[in-house]
Amino acid sequence: MLNRFRPARLVAQSSRCLPLTRARAGPLPVNNARTLATRAAAVNTKEPTERDNITTLSNGVRVASEDLPDAFSGVGVYIDAGSRYENDYVRGASHIMDRLAFKSTSTRTADEMLETVEKLGGNIQCASSRESMMYQAATFNKAIPTAVELMAETIRDPKLTDEELEGQIMTAQYEVNEIWSKAELILPELVHMAAFKDNTLGNPLLCPKERLDYINRDVIQTYRDAFYRPERLVVAFAGVPHERAVKLAEKYFGDMKASDAPGLSRTGSETSVDSLVSESSEASSESSSSSSDSSESSGGLLSKLFSPKAKKATPNPFLTRVPISTEDLTRPAHYTGGFLTLPSQPPPLNPNLPTFTHIQLAFEGLAISDDDIYALATLQTLLGGGGSFSAGGPGKGMYSRLYTNVLNQHGWVESCVAFNHSYTDSGLFGIAASCYPGRTLPMLQVMCRELHALTTDHGYSALGELEVSRAKNQLRSSLLMNLESRMVELEDLGRQVQVHGRKIPVREMTRRINELTVKDLRRVAKRVVGGMANNAGQGSGAPTVVLQEATVQGLKTTELGWDQIQDTIAQWKLGRR
């Protein structure tokens, strides 16, 4: 530590020893000590969060590392897979693959695997999403090789016994029933299904209940053959030197054989969308024309989802073994928009318990690689929102628009919060709200009012410098605080390399947030809620609404039809019709 300051002291001592002489013209003598210190400082210009490296192995596996020292290190394997790429034959396999992680392999029994995982300490898990399958672990530094070994075994060489498969299908059935009992869990699923009808991001994240009887070893193996290939893998390390990370990845994944099967397009540019657009447009127009009868319009979508009342599946001639095709892998997400309504909630058995109407309004958002994604994230933070009751008392988020303009102004609103889902080639942006029964139309009008206010140039509701500055600061602080978690840091590294091919430095992200202006946010708001996202899938620009109304004894309510909902949204100049 003392050596760091030695050159500065030498400079000070030498200057005191110099004799006093008259200044002469000519070049000044070079101070070697000061020059060396300056050069050393110039070399280390990167911040600790920018010390990332990426290496591609000979078989296509990408190895990414970020060497931030800590007591814990992280390792994760990220696979280009997920529900958006599933065809009818493997529908729901992502969910079951998630459940089958860290079970028996050719070298360990399920009990031995569990025992080894428990000895590691820390956190080891598997999670599936619409666009990725993630195996992650945060553990002690010395246990990283063991964690990589366990991941390699469960990814490359699982036994997939009938007993394990049957057990996880039963667990999935319980999860399906559980999610239907919670509106905050099922409604986001339904929003995706209505927004991307019959394609890609509209595929259910969990296994449909009627599909559970068809999930077998052959379905799982078909899924693995399509996605578990070296060119689809990113192995990420946090807190591990890059040379060590590459050696571990080479040891456990370097001998995977590359496949000649079609690759994954992250933009959808490899496939013409003409046929897709025409097909989806027909489906969208049919939905729009018949959706005034809510039970009729929602039946098709609900039958594809994990309905709690789904009957036992009957043999389907179309569910023969069909490998994942090039079209399945490269099809862009086509936003259709639409309306979906759930059966009304019955009055609670306990009259003292409240019941609420739930409504979600969404528009096509932006792809994660879009230049305007930072502005859209700032708009979500600016809208903010939450619930009418805060366990911690007044505090964070109380100055967001949905708090000040909605929750604080309308006592019949239970919750109101903005959401923003971003994917590789599309997204969803909107507001989710819950209100007292009989207030559905006023609630929809309030939601439309707040979204429309983001686009206005003048007036009291127009965006202001102060609130935009506050939202930018909140977004930056949230980003930085989240990255303090080793697991979040690890997932951020792995997913960014998977999507962008590189790690975007935190300094770059915070700079781009800080550079945003009121005009930028207003322009992006007009683009998104105006139905002009213009993503690769050539979306319709129509709004998406998912509704579940509540009933109360003694209160008569009139169900809203799709035409009335569209008229209300159009009055606020939102979306396209």
From Swiss-Prot:
Its main location: mitochondrion. Residues 269-301 have a biased composition (Low complexity). It is found in: Mitochondrion matrix. GO terms for biological process: protein processing involved in protein targeting to mitochondrion. Keywords: Mitochondrion, Transit peptide. GO terms for molecular function: metal ion binding; metalloendopeptidase activity. It comes from the Eukaryota. GO terms for cellular component: mitochondrial matrix; mitochondrion. Transmembrane segments: none annotated. Residues 1-35 form a transit peptide. Residues 259-301 are annotated as: Disordered. Belongs to the peptidase M16 family. Heterodimer of mpp (alpha) and pep (beta) subunits, forming the mitochondrial processing protease (MPP) in which mpp is involved in substrate recognition and binding and pep is the catalytic subunit. Appears to contain two domains of approximately equal size which are separated by a loop-like sequence. Substrate recognition and binding subunit of the essential mitochondrial processing protease (MPP), which cleaves the mitochondrial sequence off newly imported precursors proteins. This is Mitochondrial-processing peptidase subunit alpha. The lineage of its organism: Eukaryota, Fungi, Dikarya, Ascomycota, Pezizomycotina.
